[in-house]
Amino acid sequence: VCFPPNEACSEKNMIERIKNAPELFLVAVDKETGKIAGSLNGLATDEEVFRDEFFKDAYLNNSEGKNIMILGLSILPEYRRQGLARELVRQYALKEKKNNREKLILTCLDAKVPMYLDFGFTDHGISDSVWGGEVWHEMSLDIHKVC
């Protein structure tokens, strides 16, 4: 629903992520309807540079890793433009700060760069990622700067 087919991970990969790193999922639920409004997920690693293999291999998760590779921030269309994405990122960063993580690292398309900059991320330029045949920016957020 939130990602076009060329950018979406397979159902199998998502199930593997849930099995291997359930603690790295954060889900927003509409209190009135009980409907899932959005989610954020990632894998922990000591690596500093995003690579496409993180999308495909949940076994790359290192529960002691100092960084989190964000693999998906998804907000259903009817919940967008209400600050939910910002709040999910903030809550996720605060949670991972307590786990002694250092950075959230992600890739995003050009159109999303301003949003992530507004959230406090730094744009490191074009990523080596070729996921979905797209051109991606690599961005990071120093978790210790989040309050």
Where are these regions (language model features)?
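Conserved GNAT acetyl-CoA-binding A-motif
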Residues: V89, K95-L109
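Conserved acetyl-CoA-binding loop of GNAT-fold acetyltransferases
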Residues: L117-S127
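Conserved acyl-donor/pantetheine-binding loop and adjacent beta-alpha core of acyl/acetyltransferases
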Residues: K35-S74, R80, V130-V135
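C-terminal "cap" of GNAT-fold acetyltransferases
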Residues: E102, L109-D110, G125-C147
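Short acidic/polar active-site loop segments enriched in Thr and Asp
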Residues: L24, E102, T122
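Conserved acetyl-CoA-binding loop-helix of GNAT-fold acetyltransferases
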Residues: I75, R81-L94
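Active-site rim helix/loop that mediates acceptor-substrate recognition in acyltransferases
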Residues: P4-E32, S39-F50, F54-L60
